[in-house]
């Protein structure tokens, strides 16, 4: 063809072969038919048009024509001779040169027979060298090391480590997929001896560039693609077979390797690459580079985890350390019943470190000095941990390493939050401080002693005895949740009674036999952090003393309290929390504000014991403890709801400050409090929380109406005293919990929002009777309406339609609309096949045989702004005429014509003004009348007989009349149908 001759005459380019991957049938004469597998020889590419259409020859059908390039795939490379490196090019060096490590699948195909021979020879040589290296690994060069340890590898120097690892990775990749890369280079003798590793470190595992000057080999490692320069990016795409003009776009737009990895398919259009096919191929290459980087990083991690090298010890994450000397001293001082063998083993573990696999480092000074010591013999594991006392506190196994949190203070390794889930709990690890230091305060609040077996738990491990009145020897933080003697009478005498009550209450819990509760010890005040946590979790919703109508959700607050307490608590020491420190650390003081606000508004304890604060006795020394000790909520005796002594704070009455009588009263009222389920708060039932609050509140008001006035007076007195004490202090500051209470007062929970609270009811509902609404309605009548849900309840309602306002009444006697539906931009449709089940259900209930639905507009549409809930509404009527009437009325109401926008028609015929058109119409009518008159005259002149459909013979015509031209022009052979 002429196009082919012109192209070949220029001799500008020679194109590679392509293979068809999809079938293409030509739609025009100059196109080319293709089937999958056809070889296409490119004659002209889309260099002039950049439209993705090539001109080529189908070698199967010998036809030529245009075809889309995306239907084909390249099977040959433009310059394949530059990609191969001859085996003799570096004869003096035994290194390995590879081609492109992750070439695209488009470069895999058929090449010439000579190239295939070289490829198969290279592949065979590579595989034989790999097999030879594997044999040497098993037998020859590493024979001595493997005899000691099966995973022992020869020690290599630090510069050789990276090259050796890269070589192992390349071998693994070639074994997994030998046909993935179309570029193979021959390999030399592969040996893992020390000399060969030195040669390998000198060799460059890289990709050769396809630049015309192939003497300078660029380092194009796919793993280092992020550090490529724009020139290296250009060289890479030139290497994989893209034309030079496309590759130069990356250099022109300064696309580095980091930018290249962030490019998407739509970004390539900004590089002035107009062909979609080329952009798609480049995007596939970018994905191949990303996958190569990901696979190399994954394989590198897998390979490095197999070998434990000395120079990698500093790169690993620091593991949890255990001071075995201190543990050994504690075990030897506290435990005298250990056997001689276990004591010998423990004494030897202090001097000679216990060997573990390199993945778990017990001591930061742990090093692998001897190959025999690097791997722990698995036969010794049962012997090492045969003694049960090893894993008892404080000799249990170390905590796994964890990343430090930037916002959380350093916690002790004594307890991991991972072990507190449900029943899978472990005994907490404890560390005993010296005698002259403060007692241990546990960050997560689990103290290892049992409340049920306090007599039996004094054998091996004991906590030091402490005096509750000595503030110097007994300094407790907030998380210990103790109740000191602040203006109380005989508090120490009341503590055993509290312990008895708590032990009786906790004995009914199904999980009280777990390890945590067996090793659980209470503080001297009779409570523990476990009880505090259970108490917080069972707290009723906080209600203000002054605005009882407002509600607050306690579950989130209690969780925040526990989290803040867990952050604030220290391990080896404790200190008093002063108000000045609270100013600096507002988050740490949130738990104080939480309990102080509870104590002010609800000053009663679950056991009817009340602690009051005398403002006159609140000195600066004791004020630091007043916020945490002004309440009596730290005594929780059960996590179970059935046997809980926890009652709602507003349901209990105040009692005088007498600890003995109060505790006895609480002990006697335990069954009654457990039976009074209306007074027990149920925070887990979030859906009906609001409803249950009001029910319990009304029941309590009815039952305790006599004590109402005295309770309110005592509350006001208590609050006024505490308020005066805090206002008098200059250090008083409003806590975040109080701000939260005020902010949440005006916010209703979303779950409590009902239909009556929507804008349709608050703004759109009219107070009008059904009969009055019928008079002005476009359509009205009885219909059945389906409720919400898949199988909602069908209810009979009386509907009235006013424009796009569809309202309904429960009956015709209603004086107010019960519901409203805004049908703006809705579509009314009959029930389709998908709604057949709904229609059958409505018909089976006798609600109506004919069903239709109202479909709201699509979300986000301009006309879809309705003030009612946009959902599908189903209606049913009894007969067909009613359904037609409703459909007609609703369709008319939903037709939306915007009269503010002029109507623009696509009819492009030129028009004339209306006045001119009317003048022409009058002229046309006059011409029509004149024509009709002439026709009547012609009929009379010829004497046409209509009955016989022929000219009347009574009117003869002379021959000479036809010879005159005037007569011919005037007569013009008139017929009844008009002129001819």
Curated annotation (Swiss-Prot):
One of its GO terms (cellular component) is site of polarized growth. Changing residue 795 to E: Affects the binding to phospholipids and impairs localization to the bud, but does not affect the localization to the neck. Residues 13-77 form the SH3 domain. Signal peptide: none annotated. Pfam families: PH, SAM_2, SH3_1. The modification Phosphoserine is found at residues 104, 106, 128, 209, 393, 412, 525, 528, 589-590, 593, 644, 655, 735. The modification Phosphothreonine is found at residues 151, 158, 919. The keyword Phosphoprotein applies. Residues 589-608, 621-638 have a biased composition (Low complexity). Residues 573-582 have a biased composition (Basic and acidic residues). Residues 776-895 form the PH domain. Residues 139-163, 333-356, 390-438, 544-762, 930-980 are annotated as: Disordered. Coiled coil: none annotated. The PH domain binds to phospholipids which is important for localization to the bud. The SH3 domain is important for localization to the neck. Present with 1040 molecules/cell in log phase SD medium. Interacts with BEM1. This is BEM1-interacting protein 1. It comes from Saccharomyces cerevisiae (strain ATCC 204508 / S288c).
């Amino acid at each position: 063809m002429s196009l082919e001759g012109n192209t070949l005459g220029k001799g500008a380019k020679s194109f590679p072969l392509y293979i068809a991957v999809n079938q293409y049938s030509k739609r025009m004469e100059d196109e080319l038919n293709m089937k999958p597998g056809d070889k296409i020889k490119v004659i002209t590419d889309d260099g002039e048009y950049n439209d993705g259409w090539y001109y080529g020859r189908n070698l199967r059908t010998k036809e030529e024509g245009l075809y889309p390039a995306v239907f084909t795939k390249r099977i040959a490379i433009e310059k394949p001779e530059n990609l191969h490196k001859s085996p003799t090019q570096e004869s003096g060096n035994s290194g390995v040169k590879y081609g492109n490590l992750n070439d695209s699948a488009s470069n895999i195909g058929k090449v010439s027979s000579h190239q295939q021979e070289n490829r198969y020879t290279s592949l065979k040589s590579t595989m034989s060298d790999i097999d030879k290296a594997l044999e040497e690994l098993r037998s020859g060069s590493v024979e001595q090391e493997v005899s000691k340890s099966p995973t022992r590898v020869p020690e290599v120097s630090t510069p050789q480590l990276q090259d050796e690892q890269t070589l192992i990775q390349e071998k693994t990749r070639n074994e997994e997929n030998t046909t993935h890369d179309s570029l193979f280079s021959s390999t030399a003798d592969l040996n893992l001896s020390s000399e060969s590793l030195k040669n390998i470190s000198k060799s460059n595992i890289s990709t050769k560039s396809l630049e015309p000057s192939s003497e300078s080999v660029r380092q194009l490692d796919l793993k280092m693609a992020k550090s490529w320069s724009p020139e290296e990016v250009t060289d890479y795409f030139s290497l994989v077979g893209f034309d030079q003009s496309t590759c130069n776009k990356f250099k022109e737009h300064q696309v580095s390797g980091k930018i290249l990895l962030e490019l998407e398919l739509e970004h390539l259009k900004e590089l002035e690459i107009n062909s979609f096919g080329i952009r798609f191929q480049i995007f596939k290459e970018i994905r191949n580079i990303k996958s190569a980087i990901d696979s190399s990083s994954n394989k590198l991690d897998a390979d490095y985890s197999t070998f434990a090298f000395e120079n990698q010890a500093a790169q690993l994450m620091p593991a949890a350390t255990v001071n075995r000397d201190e543990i050994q001293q504690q075990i030897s001082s506290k435990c005298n019943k250990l056997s001689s063998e276990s004591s010998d083993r423990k004494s030897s573990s202090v001097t000679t470190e216990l060997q573990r696999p390199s993945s778990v480092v017990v001591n930061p000074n742990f090093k692998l000095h001897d190959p025999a010591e690097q791997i722990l013999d698995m036969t010794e594991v049962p012997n090492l941990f045969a003694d049960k006392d090893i894993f008892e506190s404080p000799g249990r196994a170390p905590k796994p390493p964890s990343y430090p949190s930037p916002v959380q203070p350093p916690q002790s390794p004594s307890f991991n939050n991972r072990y507190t889930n449900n029943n899978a709990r472990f005994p907490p690890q404890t560390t005993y401080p010296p005698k002259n230091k403060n007692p241990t305060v546990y960050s997560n609040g689990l103290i290892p002693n049992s409340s049920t077996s306090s007599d039996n738990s004094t054998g091996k491990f004991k906590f030091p005895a402490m005096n509750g009145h000595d503030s110097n020897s007994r300094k407790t933080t907030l998380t210990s949740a103790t109740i000191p003697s602040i203006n109380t009478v005989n508090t120490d005498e009341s503590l055993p009674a509290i312990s008895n009550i708590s032990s009786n209450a906790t004995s009914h819990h199904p999980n009280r036999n777990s390890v945590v509760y067996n090793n659980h010890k209470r503080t001297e005040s009779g409570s523990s952090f476990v009880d505090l946590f259970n108490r917080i979790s069972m707290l009723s919703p906080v209600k203000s003393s002054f605005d009882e109508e407002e509600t607050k959700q306690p579950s989130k607050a209690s969780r925040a309290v526990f989290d803040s307490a867990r952050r604030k608590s220290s391990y080896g020491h404790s200190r008093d929390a002063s108000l000045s420190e609270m100013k600096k650390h507002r988050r740490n003081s949130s738990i104080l504000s939480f309990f102080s606000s509870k104590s002010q508004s609800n000053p009663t304890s679950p056991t009817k014991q009340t602690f009051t604060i005398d403002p006159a006795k609140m000195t600066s020394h004791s004020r630091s403890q007043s916020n945490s000790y002004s309440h009596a909520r730290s005594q929780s005796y059960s996590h179970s709801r059935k046997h809980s002594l926890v009652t709602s704070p507003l349901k209990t009455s105040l009692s005088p400050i007498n600890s003995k009588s109060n505790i006895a009263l609480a002990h006697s009222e335990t069954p009654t409090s457990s039976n009074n389920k209306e007074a027990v708060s149920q925070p887990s039932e979030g859906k009906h929380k609001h409803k249950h609050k009001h029910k319990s509140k009304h029941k309590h008001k009815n039952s305790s109406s006599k004590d109402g006035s005295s309770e309110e007076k005592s509350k006001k007195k208590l609050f006024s005293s505490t308020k005066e004490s805090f206002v008098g202090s200059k250090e008083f500051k409003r806590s975040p919990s109080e701000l939260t209470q005020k902010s949440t007062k005006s916010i209703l929970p979303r779950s409590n929002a009902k239909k009556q609270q929507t804008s349709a009811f608050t703004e759109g509902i009219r107070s009008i009777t059904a009969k009055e609404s019928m008079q002005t309605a476009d359509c009205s009548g009885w219909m059945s309406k389906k409720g919400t849900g898949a199988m909602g309840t069908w209810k009979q309602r009386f509907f009235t339609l006013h424009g796009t306002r569809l309202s309904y009444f429960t009956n015709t006697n209603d004086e107010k609309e019960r519901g409203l539906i805004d049908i703006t931009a809705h579509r009314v449709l009959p029930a389709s096949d998908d709604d057949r089940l709904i229609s059958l259900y409505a018909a089976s209930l006798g609600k109506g045989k004919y069903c239709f639905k109202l479909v709201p507009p699509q979300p986000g549409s301009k006309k879809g702004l309705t003030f009612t809930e946009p959902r599908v509404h189903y209606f049913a009527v009894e007969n067909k005429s009613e359904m037609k009437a409703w459909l007609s009325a609703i369709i008319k109401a939903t037709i939306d014509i915007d009269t503010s926008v002029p109507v623009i028609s696509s009819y492009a015929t030129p028009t004339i003004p209306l006045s001119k058109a009317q003048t022409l119409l009058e002229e046309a009518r006059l011409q029509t009348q004149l024509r009709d008159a002439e026709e009547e005259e012609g009929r009379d002149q010829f004497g046409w007989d209509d009955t016989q459909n022929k000219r009347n013979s009574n009117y003869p015509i002379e021959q000479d009349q036809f010879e005159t031209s005037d007569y011919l022009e005037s007569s013009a052979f008139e017929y009844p149908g008009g002129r001819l």
